[in-house]
Amino acid sequence: MARSAYSYMAMWYRKIGREVHERLMRKILIEWRKAPAIVRVERPFRLERARKLGYKAKQGVVVVRVRLMRGPFNRRRPDSGRRPKRMGVYGITAWKSWRQVAEERAARKHPNLEVLNSYWVADDGIYRYFEVILIDCNLPTIKNDPLYSGICGREVPRRRIIRRLRERQKKTIEYLKKTLLPRLKEAPSQQ
């Protein structure tokens, strides 16, 4: 059975070209570090992944690379005095995934575009990089495309990612309500 070029690209990215890939990535990541945090790019870095998620090389489809700081969910230490255990600094995890944060930042930077999808690109010692696929719903080439009708239809609300109207975000919020709210209600109030 014949395999597509995209399957070979994915295989090279995952397994075969690891040594070559590391040498290339070192140079690329040095350039990316010097660039701004949110940059529009001409074409996706991982073409096979972008095509799987709905990217097409046509007018109205934009790819943006987003750079995020790696590390835990850092919270500011309170100024007023209390014992260290009650500072609320350590052991806190963010409610959002890295990918969701990247999508939200890209959506804020480009308010006239809608987020289609996103994917991880690379990591280095300091940063984590994602590419976000955005589409312009006002263009007729996008409006008439059946692939994008679920995002650009009349009934679909605008700026879904900022308002947490995507399925992934709704599921996360529902899960947190199911798990955290009962615990908070059961906990004895300290008075």
Swiss-Prot record:
Q: Name one Pfam family in it.
A: Ribosomal_L15e
Name of this protein: Large ribosomal subunit protein eL15
Q: Carries keyword Oxidoreductase?
A: no
Q: Which NCBIfam families match?
A: PRK04243.1
- Tell me its family: Belongs to the eukaryotic ribosomal protein eL15 family.
A molecular-function term among this protein's GO annotations: RNA binding
Q: Tell me the organism.
A: Pyrobaculum aerophilum (strain ATCC 51768 / DSM 7523 / JCM 9630 / CIP 104966 / NBRC 100827 / IM2)
Q: Which InterPro entries match?
A: Rbsml_eL15_core_dom_sf, Ribosomal_eL15, Ribosomal_eL15_arc, Ribosomal_eL15_CS, Ribosomal_uL23/eL15/eS24_sf
Query: Gene name?
Result: rpl15e
